[in-house]
């Protein structure tokens, strides 16, 4: 564990995790990435460089569908790279959308993944195309700096374009926070953009992070009540916008949320952010920096499984962390203001804003691609070519075609009709509120399918909903291929976390508003057991629910599952 005032340690404790030594000796995230990229013998890079590459917004992966066959043929794995593009608040111009579409066609697997943190993600990029892909992203005035790694990740905010003035201000704050907390190293520009090299990197400084950066990843998001679409309680720092008389006055602050855990290690668990107070809006960037530096100085650097800020808050106590924050700020944060969330989903379809329109398109699991009967990618390209507003990537992996002028609305609607694009109203409430991570075949951590499987599982659950008369009922359902929690499954009313191919832990009892953790209901079950478990529950819910009662609330009231008050009780 590191606890120093200057946060840049020349001699690291020998008990620290090996990643701390790698970061400290990486020459501010350069490592030998350039040499690895230049090696023509392999499609991979060294393991150390692969770890550092995450700070540049890319993961080395391989096609797990081909692993066994390539092993039999004595070939190395089918290596490729994922790039995650930093898009603060998920706001992109039509020109940027076209550029992302071009990159996906030229260098990736002809698809774009809209992530649960409002970023673009490309898969299947070969090593020889990695640098040009990065350059093309930069030409679009975007980047992948700090989209991954032990730093602040893409800062989220509510898309909310129909409240134009408040949203613009909130999106500006998301961008300011994201830019302020970027690493200052010149490594990204040197490696990917042929920037001028720093001759003496010993003079280089990381004024916020230091040369070992953070113990683990760090996530910040801004919610705008009544919508909790960013799942504010899942964030390391959650900011809840307080709006009075259509004016943003400040933010309530939550600390120490996080979704990830490790199967079989009960010392790891998901946790909700704790509400600690209210801050005026002009102080938000400084407050985020000071909270981040508390994690920098007191986070666990010996055990990465317990290194997230949620464990720091649990170990030191939210009162101590708040007092330390006040000390670093030089002033005291105030008591939290009143607010109320109603849901954590998206408002789909056309919504009228101030002098404009906004269309929220349902995109199942955020995968933008063309199929034989649904040319989604082609349609969005056509829209981008005529659109004069912008696009907003939603935290639920949907897409807002935003700020459509009244003059353009009919033209865009014609493209929507031509390609039969859906706002989700032809789907069940369950499917509209579904979310899945990538998992197989590219994610190296996946233990089971997720994105490729959840749609077909939902189809079978929909038969149960039809039997129960619940097809229009809004129920959140999420699936991940491993317990890292990328689709924020621990907040869903129904969730599945992969244990092995075809096997999942099933969780129930999350809140429709994203304010409560769920709890394990069945362990290591297959599809038949999933359906057999859900059928009686859905039938009971249909017959015995109270007026307006959501499924997650019902299973707790009915005694099916115990309510989780704190992440530390998640496994008990």
UniProtKB/Swiss-Prot annotation:
Q: Which UniProt key words apply to this protein?
A: 4Fe-4S, Amino-acid biosynthesis, Cysteine biosynthesis, Heme, Iron, Iron-sulfur, Metal-binding, NADP, Oxidoreductase
Catalytic activity, EC: 1.8.1.2
Q: Where is [4Fe-4S] cluster annotated to bind? A: 437, 443, 482, 486
Q: How, per the record, is the cofactor bound? A: Binds 1 siroheme per subunit.
Give any Gene Ontology cellular component. sulfite reductase complex (NADPH)
For biological process, the GO terms are: cysteine biosynthetic process; hydrogen sulfide biosynthetic process; sulfate assimilation
Q: Which GO terms describe its molecular function?
A: 4 iron, 4 sulfur cluster binding; heme binding; metal ion binding; NADP binding; sulfite reductase (ferredoxin) activity; sulfite reductase (NADPH) activity
What pathway is it annotated to? Sulfur metabolism; hydrogen sulfide biosynthesis; hydrogen sulfide from sulfite (NADPH route): step 1/1
**Cytoplasm: present as a keyword of the record?**
no
InterPro entries in the record? CysI, NiRdtase/SiRdtase_haem-b_fer, Nit/Sulf_reduc_fer-like_dom_sf, NO2/SO3_Rdtase_4Fe4S_dom, NO2/SO3_Rdtase_4Fe4S_prot, NO2/SO3_Rdtase_4Fe4S_sf, NO2/SO3_Rdtase_FeS/sirohaem_BS
- Binding-site list for siroheme: 486
What is the required cofactor set for this protein? siroheme; [4Fe-4S] cluster
| Catalytic activity from the UniProt record | hydrogen sulfide + 3 NADP(+) + 3 H2O = sulfite + 3 NADPH + 4 H(+)
Q: What does the record give as the function of this protein? A: Component of the sulfite reductase complex that catalyzes the 6-electron reduction of sulfite to sulfide. This is one of several activities required for the biosynthesis of L-cysteine from sulfate.
Which protein family is named in the record?
A: Belongs to the nitrite and sulfite reductase 4Fe-4S domain family.
Assembly and partners?
A: Alpha(8)-beta(8). The alpha component is a flavoprotein, the beta component is a hemoprotein.
Which named protein is this?
Sulfite reductase [NADPH] hemoprotein beta-component
């Amino acid at each position: 564990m590191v606890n120093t005032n200057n946060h840049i340690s020349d001699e690291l404790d020998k008990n620290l995790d090996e990643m701390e030594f790698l970061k400290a000796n990486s020459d501010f995230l350069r490592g030998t990435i350039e040499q690895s990229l230049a090696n023509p013998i392999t499609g991979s890079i060294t393991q150390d460089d692969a770890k550092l590459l995450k700070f540049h917004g890319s993961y080395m992966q391989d096609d797990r569908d081909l692993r066994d066959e390539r092993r039999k043929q004595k070939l190395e794995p089918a290596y490729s790279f994922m790039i995650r593009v930093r898009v603060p608040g998920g706001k992109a111009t039509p020109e940027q959308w076209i550029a992302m579409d071009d990159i996906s066609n030229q260098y990736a697997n002809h698809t774009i993944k809209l992530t649960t943190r409002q970023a673009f993600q490309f898969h299947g990029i070969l090593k020889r195309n990695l640098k040009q892909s990065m350059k093309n992203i930069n030409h679009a005035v975007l980047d992948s700096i700090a989209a991954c790694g032990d730093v602040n990740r893409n800062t989220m905010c509510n898309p909310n374009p129909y409240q134009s003035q408040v949203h613009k201000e909130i999106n500006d704050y998301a961008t300011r926070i994201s830019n302020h907390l970027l690493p200052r190293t010149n490594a990204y520009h040197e490696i990917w953009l042929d920037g001028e090299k720093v001759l003496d990197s010993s003079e280089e400084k990381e004024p916020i992070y230091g040369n070992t950066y953070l113990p683990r990843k760090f996530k910040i998001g801004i919610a705008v009540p009544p919508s909790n679409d960013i799942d504010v309680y899942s964030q390391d720092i959650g900011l809840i916008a307080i709006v009075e008389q259509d004016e943003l006055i400040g933010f309530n602050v939550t600390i120490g949320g996080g979704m990830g855990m490790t199967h079989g290690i009960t010392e790891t668990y998901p946790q909700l952010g704790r509400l600690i107070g209210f801050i005026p809006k002009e102080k938000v960037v400084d407050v985020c920096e000071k909270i981040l530096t508390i994690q920098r100085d007191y986070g666990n650097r010996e055990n990465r499984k317990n290194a997230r800020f949620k464990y720091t808050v649990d170990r030191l106590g939210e009162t101590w962390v708040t007092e330390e924050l006040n000390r670093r700020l030089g002033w005291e944060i105030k008591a939290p203001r009143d607010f109320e969330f109603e849901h954590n989903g998206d408002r789909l379809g056309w919504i009228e804003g101030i002098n404009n329109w906004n269309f929220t398109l349902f995109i199942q699991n955020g995968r933008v691609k063309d199929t034989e009967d649904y040319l989604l990618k082609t349609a969005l390209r056509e829209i981008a070519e005529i659109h004069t507003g912008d696009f907003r990537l939603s935290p639920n992996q949907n897409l807002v075609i935003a700020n459509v002028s009244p003059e353009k609305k009919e033209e865009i609607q014609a493209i929507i009709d031509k390609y039969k694009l859906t706002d989700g109203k032809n789907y069940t409430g369950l499917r509209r509120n579904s979310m899945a991570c990538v998992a197989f075949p590219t994610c190296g951590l996946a233990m089971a399918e997720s994105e490729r499987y959840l749609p077909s599982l939902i189809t079978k659950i929909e038969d149960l909903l039809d039997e129960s008369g619940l097809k229009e009922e809004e129920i959140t359902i999420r699936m991940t291929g491993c317990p890292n929690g990328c689709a924020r499954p621990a907040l869903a009313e129904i969730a599945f976390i992969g244990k092995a191919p075809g096997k999942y832990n099933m969780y129930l009892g999350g809140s429709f508003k994203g304010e409560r953790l769920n709890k394990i209901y069945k362990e290591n079950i297959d599809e038949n057991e999933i359906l057999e478990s859900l059928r009686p529950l859905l039938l009971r819910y249909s017959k015995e629910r109270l007026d307006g009662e959501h499924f997650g609330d019902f299973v707790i009231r009915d005694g099916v599952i115990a309510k989780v008050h704190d992440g530390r009780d998640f496994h008990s």
